[in-house]
């Protein structure tokens, strides 16, 4: 774990030195079916925090993505000082945006839209527009980067993504 973490810290530093502004850091291991709280504390958290600190120390912004479902989100509370933006599967965990705002001490959150079902997958352009307006009205613009829970499918209709962007910019 030490070697892997050292390499990822060096890689993060190299990204920032090469001119990137930020690193999207995906944290795995918060799933309760794989690790106990004690195992997470020993085998996941210290290495995650070292990598996130390396991103910050290099002068970059750290986008923390907490990956997968079945998470114990409380395990990530102490990650807040190292994250500039936090993202997770709001519709998969479930852990809503307001709960995340509290958990991460008001950090900017990225999300609001599901990536595997819902308006981005099978909605009309009008439904995309309505959902984006609802998310922004419910959460507010401050501290929100509108986005999906996780990676969009390769077959994603990009016209729906464009509609979401257009709507968000007009709100």
Each predicted region: which residue ranges?
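Active-site loop segments of alpha/beta catalytic cores
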Residues: 1-171
């Amino acid at each position: 774990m030490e070697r892997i973490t050292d390499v990822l810290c060096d890689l993060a530093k190299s990204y920032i030195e090469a001119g990137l502004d930020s690193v999207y850091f995906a944290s795995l291991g918060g799933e309760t079916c794989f690790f106990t709280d004690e195992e997470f504390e020993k085998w996941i958290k210290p290495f995650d925090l070292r990598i996130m600190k390396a991103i910050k120390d290099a002068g970059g912004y750290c986008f923390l993505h907490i990956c997968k479902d079945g998470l114990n989100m409380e395990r990530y509370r102490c990650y807040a000082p190292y994250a500039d933006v936090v993202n997770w599967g709001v519709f998969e965990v479930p852990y809503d945006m307001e709960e995340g705002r509290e958990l991460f001490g008001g950090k900017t959150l990225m999300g609001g839209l599901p990536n595997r079902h819902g308006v981005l997958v099978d909605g009309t352009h009008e439904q995309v527009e309505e959902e984006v307006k609802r998310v922004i009205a419910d959460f507010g613009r401050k501290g929100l980067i509108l986005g999906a829970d996780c990676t969009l499918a390769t077959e994603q209709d990009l016209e729906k993504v464009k509609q979401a962007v257009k709507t968000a910019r007009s709100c």
